[in-house]
């Protein structure tokens, strides 16, 4: 984990950068620290087998960390008392009942090296009051997968997980319409809205035709009723939704999404609309299929999925911000109630801080990021130098999992 000490009021910073308005991010970053988790947790596979695949949250002022392979742990010290070397205690769970060792070792699938890729793994954790929620890639039947949800009552000694949301719909590795499969494109981000409701993202697993099917759970953001396990579609046409942040002040959901080759997106999703907001995948995108239009193996793909640059011309919603080339976008969070946000990246190994004035009628979509900045929007890139899989904001500090 990596800590940014954010204090909007102080005037001195180690990393100084300025904006062109009173909403400046200069002086926000006061100092940084890097923490090394204790070796016992590392041996269980937090970083050794799944590059930059760990997920963070807080509970009772302590840092909670879950590895991609399902190891759950908490810090001995409270966040305000952290030392440079973190000491984690493992929490016993029954998560092996749902995602045992055999699932992670699915190497028989085209001789895929699970140690290198971590296709089938934990995708996020989220703690709300005394409940913990975990998303993961679930094998519904032999070699057929989706993204599902578990939940349990928080306890630092033992957590018993139960199913919260799953579906019989799954994408088969061998037998699917698009003849492609990629479990990295699984989404899995969780945010709790209130006692009854959470939002949950699911990617397309590279089964592109499902994105425009309203009856499919894939390429969607779902609203899950935690009491009934029922769901409804909040938005659709998403390739791989990696980040979610609910801005309660404006009743807006900010979504960060992996594009294909180019075309990572930040979308502003208005909630509770009569029509399901549709963001265009896999008909419109500011990216290209891997290999581009000139690759012979892509000719049929572009016929079915043309990736038009315009979204509005084809009845879709334009992204608020898009990145071309891609940055390998991950989590997005709000920093305070003053419309300041930060989005993390894996490929670009950077943080992008930005401010958005919801009352500025001159800001239209889409907005392309060029060299870390974008016209009409205050944005600043801060290079970290490591892949950033997850981050949380707690007590004016950013904690990053690298």
Task: Report residues per predicted region.
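Residue-level detector of Asp-centered blade-edge/turn motifs that repeat once per structural unit
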Residues: 56-60, 127-130, 192-195, 247-250, ...
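Conserved beta-propeller blade signature
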Residues: 62-66, 131-135, 197-201, 252-256, ...
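Short coil/turn segments at the loop-to-beta-strand junctions that recur within blades
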Residues: 89, 167-172, 238-241, 384-388
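Asp-box/WD-like beta-propeller blade repeats and closely related beta-sheet repeat scaffolds
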Residues: 116-120, 143-191
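Conserved beta-strand position repeated once per blade in WD40 beta-propeller domains
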Residues: 52-55, 124, 189, 243, ...
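Aromatic- and glycine-enriched pocket-lining scaffold segments that form the walls
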Residues: 179-205, 214, 219
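Beta-propeller domain segments
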Residues: 5-35, 42-44, 65, 73, ...
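Beta-propeller domains
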Residues: 15-36, 59-107, 145, 153-160
């Amino acid at each position: 984990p990596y800590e940014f000490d954010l204090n909007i009021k102080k005037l001195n910073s180690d990393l100084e950068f300025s904006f062109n308005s009173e909403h400046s991010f200069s002086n926000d970053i006061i100092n940084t620290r890097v923490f090394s988790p204790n070796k016992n947790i590392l041996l269980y596979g937090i970083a050794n087998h799944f590059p930059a695949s760990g997920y963070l949250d807080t509970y009772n002022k302590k840092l909670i960390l879950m590895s991609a392979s399902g190891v759950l742990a908490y810090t001995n010290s409270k966040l305000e008392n952290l030392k440079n070397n973190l000491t984690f205690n493992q929490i016993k769970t029954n998560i092996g009942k749902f995602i045992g060792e055999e699932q992670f070792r699915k190497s028989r699938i085209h001789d895929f090296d699970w140690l290198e890729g971590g296709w089938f793994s934990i995708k996020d954790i989220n703690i709300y009051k005394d409940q913990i929620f975990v998303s993961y890639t679930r094998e519904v039947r032999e070699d057929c997968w989706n993204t599902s949800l578990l939940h349990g009552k928080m306890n630092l000694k033992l957590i018993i997980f139960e199913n919260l949301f799953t579906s019989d719909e799954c994408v088969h590795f061998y037998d699917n319409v698009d003849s492609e499969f990629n479990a990295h494109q699984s989404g899995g981000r969780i945010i709790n809205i209130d006692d009854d409701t959470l939002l949950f993202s699911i990617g397309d697993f590279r089964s592109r035709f499902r994105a425009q099917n309203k009856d499919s759970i894939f390429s969607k953001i779902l609203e899950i009723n935690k009491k009934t396990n029922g769901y409804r579609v909040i938005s659709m046409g998403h390739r791989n939704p990696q980040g979610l942040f609910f801005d309660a002040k404006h009743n807006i959901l900010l979504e960060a999404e992996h594009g294909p080759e180019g075309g990572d997106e930040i979308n502003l999703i208005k909630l509770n609309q009569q029509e399901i907001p549709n963001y265009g995948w896999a008909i419109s995108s500011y990216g290209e299929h891997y290999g581009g239009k000139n690759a012979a193996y892509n000719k049929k793909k572009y016929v079915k999925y043309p990736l038009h640059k315009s979204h509005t011309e084809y009845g879709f919603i334009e992204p608020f911000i898009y990145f071309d080339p891609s940055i390998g976008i991950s989590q997005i969070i709000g920093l305070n109630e003053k419309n300041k946000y930060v989005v993390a990246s894996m490929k670009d190994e950077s943080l992008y801080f930005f401010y958005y004035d919801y009352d500025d009628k001159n800001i239209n979509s889409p907005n392309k990021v060029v060299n870390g900045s974008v016209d009409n929007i205050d944005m600043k890139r801060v290079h970290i130098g490591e892949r950033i899989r997850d981050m949380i904001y707690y007590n004016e500090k950013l904690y990053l999992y690298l």
